[in-house]
């Protein structure tokens, strides 16, 4: 493929944003990787690698780090946002006066914005019905950077943008599958991090493999209830953005959310566990957002509710498990 005429801007230089930047730059595309932290950008520019969040993977010549948001967006049509969900709205607001009508917005952020809003709703409110896309699926940043085989889902509201973005990203080692269910993909990405905390807690308490499998399976049911209420497709649940990402995040210790849950299950204080991770723990923030959404729409999500009580009401993890085990039996 010939490199695209215009550079692509990636807003967010954490591990996942950097991994996606590497995928694009290795295909010869010009990539501008933006971070709001000037000292971090200085390091990346001097060292040619993101030693803070994704060390050992040198930047190709076409990948440049930026701190000036305006400069990073100049002459750019396609923007890929990869910041924590709690910062998503702020980034959209900051870039709003710097873009034009031709801009197309994609994101690799997984979660809900403040007020339990889906991210495409935030984009539509601030920017109108621009071409949008969300990328999600089982994709550990270190494995993507190491060029290990990975498959993700890309859902969009615009067929041309979907086609172009898949062409930008897709390769033998990074396979991108088209999807038209933005709602389902976004909600799956929000809930799976909460369930990863739950399975981490279970494993930290040494409850065994049977319990882990049960949590993943019943968690998928909770995910399905939420997706159904908001008009998402049930097929998304068994795809890469649903079951695929859920299994990976709940079982691999590279998952920050799982490691956070493990620490809580082992009796580590919440604040100490959070500090030990070193990067954003999406499930910690999104438990509150998903919990509020479930309460508002009367959706039964017992695992999510117990994780919320552990994180925000100081419920002891052992007690949370006991209460789940004491629930009345129901039809599967």
Swiss-Prot record:
Annotated positions binding sn-glycerol 3-phosphate: 110, 137, 139, 192, 245, 255-257
Alphabetical list of InterPro entries matching this protein: 6-PGluconate_DH-like_C_sf, 6PGD_dom2, G3P_DH_NAD-dep, G3P_DH_NAD-dep_C, G3P_DH_NAD-dep_N, NAD(P)-bd_dom_sf
Example GO molecular function: NAD binding
PROSITE patterns given in the database record: NAD_G3PDH
Gene3D superfamilies referenced in this protein's UniProt entry, alphabetically: N-(1-d-carboxylethyl)-l-norvaline Dehydrogenase, domain 2, NAD(P)-binding Rossmann-like Domain
Binding locations of NADPH: 15-16, 110, 141, 256, 282
GO CC terms: cytosol
Main enzyme class: oxidoreductase
The gene coding this protein: gpsA
Pathway: Membrane lipid metabolism; glycerophospholipid metabolism
Keyword Oxidoreductase: yes
Catalytic activity, EC: 1.1.1.94
GO biological process terms, semicolon-separated: carbohydrate metabolic process; glycerol-3-phosphate biosynthetic process; glycerol-3-phosphate catabolic process; glycerophospholipid biosynthetic process
Protein name listed in UniProt: Glycerol-3-phosphate dehydrogenase [NAD(P)+]
Family: Belongs to the NAD-dependent glycerol-3-phosphate dehydrogenase family.
Alphabetical list of SUPFAM superfamilies matching this protein: 6-phosphogluconate dehydrogenase C-terminal domain-like (SSF48179), NAD(P)-binding Rossmann-fold domains (SSF51735)
Catalytic activity: sn-glycerol 3-phosphate + NAD(+) = dihydroxyacetone phosphate + NADH + H(+); sn-glycerol 3-phosphate + NADP(+) = dihydroxyacetone phosphate + NADPH + H(+)
Active site: 192 (proton acceptor)
Primary subcellular site in the record, as a coarse category: cytoplasm
Functional summary from the UniProt entry: Catalyzes the reduction of the glycolytic intermediate dihydroxyacetone phosphate (DHAP) to sn-glycerol 3-phosphate (G3P), the key precursor for phospholipid synthesis.
Compartmental location: Cytoplasm
Keywords, in A-Z order: Cytoplasm, Lipid biosynthesis, Lipid metabolism, NAD, NADP, Nucleotide-binding, Oxidoreductase, Phospholipid biosynthesis, Phospholipid metabolism
């Amino acid at each position: 493929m010939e490199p695209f005429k215009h550079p692509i801007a990636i807003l967010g230089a954490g591990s996942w944003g950097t991994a996606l930047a590497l995928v694009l730059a290795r295909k010869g595309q010009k990539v501008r990787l933006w971070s709001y932290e000037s000292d971090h950008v200085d390091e990346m520019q001097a060292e040619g690698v993101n030693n803070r969040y994704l060390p050992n993977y040198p930047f190709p010549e076409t990948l440049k780090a930026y701190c000036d948001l305006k400069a990073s967006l100049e002459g750019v049509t396609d923007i890929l946002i990869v910041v924590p969900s709690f910062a998503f709205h702020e980034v959209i607001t900051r870039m709003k006066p710097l873009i034009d009508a031709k801009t197309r917005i994609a994101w690799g952020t997984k979660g809900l914005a403040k007020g339990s809003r889906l991210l495409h709703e935030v984009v539509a409110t601030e920017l109108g019905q621009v071409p949008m896309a969300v990328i999600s699926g089982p994709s550990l940043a270190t494995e993507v950077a190491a060029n290990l085989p990975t498959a993700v889902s890309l859902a969009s509201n615009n067929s041309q943008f979907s086609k172009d973005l898949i062409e930008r990203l897709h390769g033998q080692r990074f396979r991108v599958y088209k999807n038209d269910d933005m709602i389902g993909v976004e909600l799956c990405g929000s809930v799976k991090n909460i369930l990863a905390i739950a399975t981490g807690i279970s494993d930290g308490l040494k409850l065994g493999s049977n319990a882990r499998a049960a949590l993943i399976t019943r968690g998928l049911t909770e995910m399905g209830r939420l997706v159904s209420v908001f008009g998402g497709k049930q097929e998304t649940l068994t795809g890469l953005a649903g079951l695929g990402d859920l299994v990976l995040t709940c079982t691999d210790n590279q998952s920050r959310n799982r490691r956070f849950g493990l620490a809580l299950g082992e009796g580590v204080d919440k604040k100490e566990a959070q500090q030990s991770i070193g990067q954003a723990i999406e499930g910690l923030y999104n438990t509150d957002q998903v919990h509020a959404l479930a309460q508002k729409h009367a959706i039964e999500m017992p695992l999510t509710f117990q994780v919320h009580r552990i994180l925000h009401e100081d419920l002891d993890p052992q007690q949370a498990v006991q209460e789940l085990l004491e629930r009345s039996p129901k039809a599967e």
